[in-house]
Structure formats: structure tokens, C-alpha cells
């Protein structure tokens, strides 16, 4: 689960541009 938590923190910066689904805006 450590990887999951790390992934959530990394995805937070990604979602700013790509959105929660991972799609580019």
C-alpha cells in the first residue's frame, strides 16, 4: 500500500493538467 499512497501523491500533480482520468485537457 505504500506504492498506492506514493502514486496518489504523484497523481495529484498530474491531475492538475490531465484530470483524474489521466486524459490530457
UniProtKB/Swiss-Prot annotation:
Residues at which heme binds: 14, 17
Localization per Swiss-Prot or TrEMBL: Periplasm
Region forming the signal peptide: none
Domain of life (superkingdom): Bacteria
Modifications the protein undergoes after translation, according to the UniProt entry: Binds 2 heme groups per subunit.
Region Disordered, residue ranges: 1-25
GO-annotated molecular function: electron transfer activity; heme binding; metal ion binding
Annotated Gene Ontology cellular component terms: periplasmic space
InterPro entries in the record: Cyt_c-like_dom_sf
Primary role: Diheme, high potential cytochrome c believed to be an intermediate electron donor to terminal oxidation systems.
Name this protein carries in UniProt: Putative cytochrome c4
Biological source species: Aliivibrio fischeri (Vibrio fischeri)
Lineage of producing organism: Bacteria, Pseudomonadati, Pseudomonadota, Gammaproteobacteria, Vibrionales
